[in-house]
């Protein structure tokens, strides 16, 4: 407070930064300009290096973690490298407080609407929780491949070079370029399934995204790692 006698002044006294809010509006426009900047081509970046990875778009931003938190830089890096296809099994603790402080969340999405899928387990069983994610995703992938194989003859009439059923089933998704190529093939498949509008095509349409490789991660805070649960024995 600037006065010990004026009781209207508190320890923190809020006043407008600039009358009329002109400064805030100018900064909002600067931020909108920043968001419109194009992203780097992920296939041309050396994401295996620290320098190269930092050119990737973070899909974890503005979290409510404590200042100096040692975990969030790693979570941000994870979101840069795998965020557009990440599935995260979170353990209750710090990572659930800064990661799911609803109605806000630091987990973001890119211009295509892709971003991490995040869920939290209350029971400190993140290992089992994450394993369940992995098993269910693998099962959905096999199920989608089986349905796709049944529709091979129908889809062959719509195939072009690089978008055949065989290319989808045998896709190499071991690197960024392969995953992007698979996304394009699955997009082609999705369009054709919608046009077909048969029970079989609609069934496959419900799980078609499982044909794109997912990256499953288990995240926990310090409480999960050291304090909570059965003395860490279940971890």
Located regions from the model:
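Glycine- and acidic
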Residues: 54-65, 125-130, 167, 171, ...
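Iron-sulfur cluster-binding cysteine motifs and their immediate structural context
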Residues: 1-22, 26, 33, 49, ...
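N-terminal leader/propeptide and maturation segments of large enzyme subunits in energy/redox metabolism
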Residues: 122-197
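Thiamine diphosphate
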Residues: 71-77, 84-87, 97-104, 196-235
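Short secondary-structure boundary/capping segments
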Residues: 19-21, 30-33, 102-111, 232-235
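Mobile "lid/hinge" segments at catalytic clefts and subdomain interfaces of large enzymes
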Residues: 100-138
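Generic, well-ordered alpha-helical scaffold segments in large soluble proteins
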Residues: 1-6, 72, 77, 81-85, ...
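Gly-rich Lys/Arg/Thr-decorated short loops/hinges at beta-loop-alpha junctions or inter-strand turns
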Residues: 50-61, 183-189, 212
